[in-house]
Regions:
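Signature of N-terminal electron-transfer/Fe-S-associated modules in redox systems
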Residues: 1-160
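Single conserved hydrophobic/aromatic residue that forms the stacking wall/gate
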Residues: 161-170
Length: 170
């Protein structure tokens, strides 16, 4: 995979043949479960742990950090905006949840979101400084709205998501 190759060559050299310091990147699970290794690989958002070199076209592989998030260093980005958006939108369970067996499959599919940011990288409406929280928030809202029982918190979330925004009233 791309992650296995990253920094495995010693010494690491740039295009001019100069020795460079190892590239900083994040990973945790190495098995497509955490999303920490999300990056642009040949200009496409992918998880580096599940991208195999033989599937990439061309003799050159270009690795870049996801561009919609603040850069920390090399291929490391700051995804904290994803968690801040969930806090701002009150997306958590506050009361006991009843799991309707008929909604198991959609809930399972929504729980597969790794919050890696790949979907937001290609979303024209998302920016780290913008008001649109993106798919990550929508997936979490779906889970909350389908699980939490009647409560003040649920009513507040429903009101938030069904009320027109100030932009919609123009």
């Amino acid at each position: 995979t791309v992650l296995k190759e990253l920094n495995s060559r010693t010494p690491l050299k740039d295009n001019s043949g100069n020795i460079v310091t190892p590239i900083s990147w994040e990973c945790s699970c190495m098995v497509r479960k955490c999303g920490a290794c999300a990056m642009l690989i040949n200009e496409r958002p992918r998880l580096a742990c599940s991208t195999f070199l033989h599937t990439l076209k061309g003799s050159t592989i270009i690795l870049e950090p996801l561009s919609k998030f603040p850069l920390v260093r090399d291929l490391i980005i700051d995804r904290s905006i994803l968690f801040e958006n969930l806090k701002k939108l009150n997306l958590w369970l506050e009361s006991e949840a009843y799991m309707n067996p008929w909604t198991h499959e959609p809930r399972y599919q929504s729980a597969r979101c790794l919050m890696c940011g790949c979907c937001l990288e290609v979303c024209p409406n998302f920016s780290a400084n913008g008001t649109f929280a993106g798919t990550v928030a929508a997936v979490n809202a779906f889970r909350i709205l389908n699980e939490e029982q009647e409560s003040t918190h649920l009513n507040e979330i429903c009101l938030l998501y069904t009320s027109p925004s100030p932009r919609d009233t123009r």
